[in-house]
């Protein structure tokens, strides 16, 4: 055997190790559609729900507990009846949850506490901003001018446009 030939031989180091076999489930869904959004079926139920705009991780856990769904299961492992129950609950705007957990409290027209999801939330936020502009509130005027709305300082941050820099005097 030549000296250099031992270096050219590749040894399979993983050959002795046993790899755990993945259990294939025929009912597993890799993509679950809820509220017009595709959710990754390989994520745990509360975490997958938090991918929806308007539902955070905490609300995802609360929804799973309210519907008696297992929080340690992946969303793709749920049965079709469970998924349908979940879809109906998420897409309903009124939840039987504490007020502090909802994202649209005391709606101006009806006075109800709602939790909006996905495009409903985006549309409602835009309508609220337009209402503030229409009634000429302080926040509405700040929105119109493109300035900071929530009381942040504007002296040094939030500048838009070209940066000019310091101009030196000509000598």
UniProtKB/Swiss-Prot annotation:
PROSITE patterns: RIBOSOMAL_S13_1, RIBOSOMAL_S13_2. Residues 144-158 have a biased composition (Basic residues). Residues 1-24, 144-164 are annotated as: Disordered. Keywords: Ribonucleoprotein, Ribosomal protein, RNA-binding, rRNA-binding. Residues 1-11 have a biased composition (Polar residues). Belongs to the universal ribosomal protein uS13 family. Part of the 30S ribosomal subunit. Forms a loose heterodimer with protein S19. Forms two bridges to the 50S subunit in the 70S ribosome. This is Small ribosomal subunit protein uS13. It comes from Thermoplasma acidophilum (strain ATCC 25905 / DSM 1728 / JCM 9062 / NBRC 15155 / AMRC-C165).
């Amino acid at each position: 055997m030549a000296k250099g030939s031992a270096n050219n031989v590749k040894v399979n180091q993983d050959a002795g190790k046993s790899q755990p076999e993945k259990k294939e489930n025929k009912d597993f869904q890799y993509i679950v559609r809820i509220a017009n959004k595709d959710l990754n079926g390989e994520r745990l139920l509360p975490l997958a729900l938090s991918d929806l705009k308007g539902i955070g991780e905490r609300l995802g856990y609360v929804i799973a507990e309210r519907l008696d769904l297992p929080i340690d299961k992946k969303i793709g492992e749920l049965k079709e009846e469970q998924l349908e129950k979940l879809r109906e609950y998420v897409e309903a705007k009124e939840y039987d949850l504490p007020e502090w957990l909802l994202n649209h409290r005391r709606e101006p027209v009806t006075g109800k506490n709602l939790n909006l999801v996905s495009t409903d939330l985006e549309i409602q936020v835009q309508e609220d901003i337009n209402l503030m502009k229409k009634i000429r509130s302080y926040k509405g005027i700040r929105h119109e001018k493109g300035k900071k709305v929530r009381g942040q300082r504007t002296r040094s941050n939030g500048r838009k446009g070209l940066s000019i820099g310091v101009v030196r005097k000509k000598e």
